[in-house]
Amino acid sequence: MGLPTLEFSDSYLDSPDFRERLQCHEIELERTNKFIKELIKDGSLLIGALRNLSMAVQKFSQSLQDFQFECIGDAETDDEISIAQSLKEFARLLIAVEEERRRLIQNANDVLIAPLEKFRKEQIGAAKDGKKKFDKESEKYYSILEKHLNLSAKKKESHLQEADTQIDREHQNFYEASLEYVFKIQEVQEKKKFEFVEPLLSFLQGLFTFYHEGYELAQEFAPYKQQLQFNLQNTRNNFESTRQEVERLMQRMKSANQDYRPPSQWTMEGYLYVQEKRPLGFTWIKHYCTYDKGSKTFTMSVSEMKSSGKMNGLVTSSPEMFKLKSCIRRKTDSIDKRFCFDIEVVERHGIITLQAFSEANRKLWLEAMDGKEPIYTLPAIISKKEEMYLNEAGFNFVRKCIQAVETRGITILGLYRIGGVNSKVQKLMNTTFSPKSPPDIDIDIELWDNKTITSGLKNYLRCLAEPLMTYKLHKDFIIAVKSDDQNYRVEAVHALVHKLPEKNREMLDILIKHLVKVSLHSQQNLMTVSNLGVIFGPTLMRAQEETVAAMMNIKFQNIVVEILIEHYEKIFHTAPDPSIPLPQPQSRSGSRRTRAICLSTGSRKPRGRYTPCLAEPDSDSYSSSPDSTPMGSIESLSSHSSEQNSTTKSASCQPREKSGGIPWIATPSSSNGQKSLGLWTTSPESSSREDATKTDAESDCQSVASVTSPGDVSPPIDLVKKEPYGLSGLKRASASSLRSISAAEGNKSYSGSIQSLTSVGSKETPKASPNPDLPPKMCRRLRLDTASSNGYQRPGSVVAAKAQLFENVGSPKPVSSGRQAKAMYSCKAEHSHELSFPQGAIFSNVYPSVEPGWLKATYEGKTGLVPENYVVFL
């Protein structure tokens, strides 16, 4: 129930009811006053908490800014560089958010605290002053009235008239005070409605402005976030592949002889105890010793472990160097210590007595120093596999396997990822490579299933006496893909492939051509270029020595295979540029990180720090929005190239050829716009470096589930890659273990983790294009003039780089104006500014369009856009 109304006429009567109603208003004003005091106190605490939060976030961002990633190896992949740079990018993003919070905190006192305090003091305070005046006048009036009424009627008339005049004057003063008090109370009650609420509204507006700015930053940050997810997924894939290889190496080291000595620059090295004379006998001091047989140089340095704060607790002294004269095993009965031997050196008189750790270790030292002990063969760490050779039988076997796969199983899910049964694979190998088998033996595809054939093909390549890409060129390939210049990577790999022996290059040509075809069906088999690189990288480029350092280079081996697949036509069907210098060993440099993808260089305009999309809403393409992108990566980016992920409205993209004759693969688009995605996670495993008795059934085989989603919709995903790399439309979703995860419909949140890849799916496996020979038409055209419509693209930002990327997409050769061209495929226009034409149509006045991948041409008197890869110039 509301407050009672105060009438001015009631002030004249000053009835008990009036006083009661007046008291209700006074109680309400007092309650409001206390509430405002508490609100000001709580608001001050809130502002203080915001200030403390801001300081904590700034300190957190500074910690991110100061930390420096270091990776194993002498070079870093593009993914590793992006990840290393990400902490600084996170710090810059947090700083941008805190800048907005700082403005909120600065304005909060003026917007919230000061107006509330002013209202409390000026308005409610004025009402209190009015009450004091009213009470004073009331008390004075009724006191004088009481005295006036007590006057005797016998008083003089003049005295009575004076008393009447005084009482009238006091009553008038009381009446005016009462009216003013009533007016002020009602004024405060009315002003309370806006002067009290307006500061709160202003504060909330500022708070929501801060939140909205955070939302805008999140929107603008989305492209970088998505690319970083791709980088993280690639790195996770490489880790899974490398970890398995390192684990195998570790297990072999465990099972090897305890005194196994790995290859090094020294003939022999290790710890030895050296007998040193003391005034009261002898003492044995541990030294780290090395010996070079060529120069007969023996060095030893004191090495002792201390539980101090020094690194590793190891204290070493400067090494002493000697030239060895002789080495003799110490007789057992001549010393009470075991495993001893004596050496003579030029620099000292007498002998130096050394103690090895074991009898086998002493034999190794004696053998290295040409001692009198018999020479023992160094233990082998790895049992040699039965070797295969690049002979006629091998070429026939590979061709037959590829023919069988391409005939019946190229679209099978997890092709080459899921291994066959071990016994069947061994039977296939024994049958094919038996000494009694003819070189051109056929493979009965009815007898052998697809998994057995693919595992047999990989097993043959693993068991070659020398890997297909040779030990000699192994380091050169690795150095080539470690280059900062992505164009040079391709050119260097191109040149190195042509340095391979003829048979090796021929076999590599056959295999890579097949892998290109496999990757073109990645929509069905999910074997993208990235996945194939993970599988065949270690197989085609295994290192001569299995060391942890070699395992760390597996990620670069994968990149080599990706380059071979993506640039197959150029590498195998064109001669390399003789002016391209071959790779030279490089020392590790930190300069690449300064050129890493970074979004926060340069000054920032409001809401322009990250450009969230590259086209206007009414254009034919849209950038991926956070609403349609779960936390998991949609596709796996190749670590040696920069790619763009975008979505399309068109549902009728047809295949078409891009430069190099490699078709694109476009994902069917959604028909109703529902956000329905099938999510799948990957845990890729390396499928190489297995023992002869072990196949992919043990190392690679994972459970495979269909990729599903709640509806029959399939939001389109398309990747556009920067030239001169071909195979631009290949999807790079990495998968060794595939499992379906339900995705929520509509605006429900997705449950994928950041380590999970997301894949577009429907209730049924996506069907291939009706005519697989047709290359897909460019599903999206970006208007370059709208590329920066949503924000300022700073130099060096990933969005600016991606905008430039779209400017470079297309044929690497410039198209001259006014030429004629012929249509290789038919095409039906999807927009009014496109041309429809049949196969064989002749176009005139053909010249480049401002939209990448499209040409402007005239056909039958009509001028419009045609897909660049649908035509050939006459």
UniProtKB/Swiss-Prot annotation:
The keyword Phosphoprotein applies. Residues 687-697 have a biased composition (Basic and acidic residues). Residues 376-572 form the Rho-GAP domain. Gene3D superfamilies: Arfaptin homology (AH) domain/BAR domain, Pleckstrin-homology domain (PH domain)/Phosphotyrosine-binding domain (PTB), Rho GTPase activation protein, SH3 Domains. It comes from the Eukaryota. InterPro entries: AH/BAR_dom_sf, BAR_dom, GRAF_fam, PH-like_dom_sf, PH_domain, PH_GRAF, Rho_GTPase_activation_prot, RhoGAP_dom. The record marks R417 as: Arginine finger. Residues 265-374 form the PH domain. Residues 620-650 have a biased composition (Low complexity). Residues 225-261 form a coiled coil. Residues 816-874 form the SH3 domain. The modification Phosphoserine is found at S683, S740, S753, S756, S811. One of its GO terms (biological process) is negative regulation of vascular associated smooth muscle contraction. Residues 575-720, 749-777 are annotated as: Disordered. Residues 667-686, 700-711, 749-762 have a biased composition (Polar residues). Residues 7-262 form the BAR domain. May influence blood pressure by functioning as a GTPase-activating protein for RHOA in vascular smooth muscle. PANTHER family: OLIGOPHRENIN 1, RHO GTPASE-ACTIVATING PROTEIN 42. This is Rho GTPase-activating protein 42.
